[in-house]
Amino acid sequence: MAISKRGDFANPQKSPWNFEKFQSDLERKMMLRLESDPHVQKWMKRHGIVIPWIDGQKHQRKYSPDFLVEYEDGRRVIIEVKDPSRMDSPDILRKRKSAEIWCKQRGMEYVMMTMG
């Protein structure tokens, strides 16, 4: 299980904000990775995207994905980071399916990944 470590990522160079909040060590590690990736033009955690999805009890929910990333080749990608132990959770899979459809309708990509 991921360590729940929250905090501020100060002065990111590729985010339009002067800080970004992280909710876990996985998110913090992804921020470091995005900052160092020469192909990433811009990334943000505070992007305002909310994706509707239906849970196992057929209730509509809303989900805000972890990152919106813009690459130098023009691709816009939503990245969700998860602990490996949660990748196959039924609700995570439902969110993923909804996010993939949402992104496809907007010419974007969706990637779910884990980080060690």
Give each language-model segment a name.
Residues M1-G116:
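Electrostatic, structured charged patches in enzyme active sites and in nucleic-acid/phosphate-binding
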